[in-house]
Amino acid sequence: MGGRGLLLLPVLLLLGAAGPRLQPAESADPEDPVSAERSLAWGPGLEAGVTVPVRYFYIQAVSAAGRNFSRSPPGRTQFKVVIKALSPKEVTRIYTPRPLDRNDGTFLMRYRMYGSVTKGLKIEILYGDQHVAQSPYILKEPVYHEYCDCPVEDPEVWQDMMSCPSQEPQITKDFISFPTIDLQRMLKEIPAKFSQTGGAIVHYTILDNHIYRRSLGKYTDFKMFSDEMFLSLARKVRLPDVEFYLNVGDWPVEHRKVNDTPGPVPVISWCGSVDSRDIILPTYDVTHSTLETLRGVTNDLLSIQGNTGPFWENKTERALFRGRDSREERLHLVKLSKENPELLDAGITGYFFFREKEKELGKAQLMGFFDFFKYKYQVNVDGTVAAYRFPYLLLGDSLVLKQDSQYYEHFYIGLKPWKHYVPVKRNLEDLLEKIKWAKENDEEARKIAKQGQLTARELLQPHRFYCYYYKVLQKYAERQASKPEIRDGMELVPQPDDRDSVCTCHRKKPLREDL
């Protein structure tokens, strides 16, 4: 995953999304000058073959003594990045905002391409007027933008290019219940069982790298989110031929146990629960924000890393909650807040489920998400299902107090209570006690917050979502007992029109003209 800056790494230094990990004793003095030469640069955005909507890489500020900065470097000099086509004959638009300062000595650089280049890119990373690490980084291969339809034919090659994990624990766990997948049974059972008038099931077939689907049930508008991700994935790698049912509703739907007769069927969903057997994908929320980073969304998993508020010691020592009334415990939070304002600041920003409570509890003003991190503690309480804000909260540098929940997302399996967050009982009866604990054990609370943030940075990298989606489709296809087909009522989901952008795919063989 790394660029050529990896050549500078000491033997004991690990690089990932979280950044180089050195012992605290080796941190640079905050007043030390930055060494451009000894600073580090790495990440998928320095690799030509890693095509994602917004490419990204990381920079670690290092002192002349070879020590990592753990705070923003002193002075007004900043890192800057210049990216352009390697060949002067190629012209493409590349949006390159300033690197995001993650307030821990590392910086996150994002760039979005609006056209492809066949000769490669030149990426200059500078501190002042000096090149950082191995800058300039020369990507000599074709570099494709998001909408260039140029899939890698060999999925093993693609997974290697993307540095996909060899195993995803949640995928392994989800498929234990389904050693084989009987498509014929699913064709008979799922439309009847799950797609009544109020259903939210979409029937997909992927064949020859084309996406086909039909909607089953009334509430399937959220297929727009699954469509865009499957299409994006198909532009990057040849997908297996596979046929499946995707639940685009909030709740998981398959609650039968393996030893039931009949047993469960493998419905794919965005959220799982301890009493269901659905196969889980990354939520529509994190995938859509990944697709629309630097364009159509304000909160995404990259931008939030440069907007985490004041340093830990300068944050407000209270817990914060803002959100809709989508679960009764959220109303209880507001009552606790009114009784204990010195510990908790909680408010409901919109009423739908419990409108009769608005007069009693009041309505809080909307609050910019980045402003959440002015507070030292964040309360995460379920909505209708798992609160989709949880990954964003983890990426900040506040301590997350997470309500015990029967629901989970695809990455929860990589988290542990008291290591990455502080657990709170389902009924919130110990919430105030946990806030008091955090205030009385500030250093331990800070360590948990930091470990949660570092782990989230690793698990929630955008390219990991593409790996995850592909592995679910691959595993599903491997277990199908019959060949997928385009069924009656299915329609082709076309790739978006991108005719105004340059896209010359070197992987596609030119058409031969008959002589």
Locate the predicted segments by residue.
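Classical eukaryotic N-terminal signal peptides for Sec-dependent ER targeting/secretion
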Residues: M1-L13, R21
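Short S/T/G/P-enriched beta-strand
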Residues: L13-F69, G128-D160
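Short flexible loop/turn segments that cap and initiate beta-strands
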Residues: V50, V54-R55, A61-P97
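Hydrophobic beta-strand positions in extracellular immunoglobulin-like domains
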Residues: A61, Y111-M113
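Short coil/turn segments at secondary-structure boundaries
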Residues: R71-G75, T96-P97, R112, I123-L126, ...
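Secretory-pathway glycan-assembly enzymes, especially type II membrane glycosyltransferases
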Residues: K89, T106-L108, G115-G120, Y127, ...
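Aromatic sugar-binding surface patches on proteins
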Residues: P99-R110
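Catalytic binding pocket for nucleotide-activated donors in carbohydrate/polymer assembly enzymes
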Residues: L366-P494, D498-K509, E513-D514
